[in-house]
């Protein structure tokens, strides 16, 4: 009788633990706010950076700058940040992305085919035939 009560108590504790995990998910390291301003002086002190996508676990797109022991979340649309990332790419021998993170998804049309931007050099086809 006492063993059955102990087993029942253990099962109840396990169930309670499982439901509390579902209600209160583990804390993640997502940015919840982004700054829309960043100084050039701050960018000089960046040791590394990473990209947070607005899919999956995190709801906000951000570039996370690591400065000393701090994480600073910046809007990925910030003009100064974009210029710094382009300049850093050149310094890093043309690496695709200075910050680690997921690559941008390819553009797809309604049928799921990957689309590319068409670049035309010189005149257009219909003008050349005239």
Swiss-Prot record:
Glycan-modified residues: 78
Signal peptide: 1-16
Pfam families named among the record's database cross-references: IL8
Source superkingdom: Eukaryota
Sequence segments annotated as region (Disordered): 92-130
Gene3D superfamilies linked: 2.40.50.40
Tissue: Mainly expressed in testis, epithelial cells of normal colon, kidney, Peyer patches, lymph nodes. Also found in lower levels in brain, spleen and lung.
Keywords: Chemotaxis, Cytokine, Disulfide bond, Glycoprotein, Secreted, Signal
Keyword Electron transport listed: no
Keyword Glycoprotein applies: yes
Positions of disulphide bridges: 30-58, 31-73
GO molecular function: chemokine activity
GO biological process: immune response; negative regulation of leukocyte tethering or rolling; positive regulation of cell-matrix adhesion; positive regulation of cytosolic calcium ion concentration
Compartment annotation: Secreted
Entry's Gene Ontology cellular component terms: extracellular space
Main subcellular localisation: secreted
Biased composition range(s): Basic residues: 104-124
Family: Belongs to the intercrine beta (chemokine CC) family.
Job of this protein: Chemotactic for resting CD4, CD8 T-cells and eosinophils. Binds to CCR10 and induces calcium mobilization in a dose-dependent manner.
Protein name as annotated: C-C motif chemokine 28
Source lineage: Eukaryota, Metazoa, Chordata, Craniata, Vertebrata
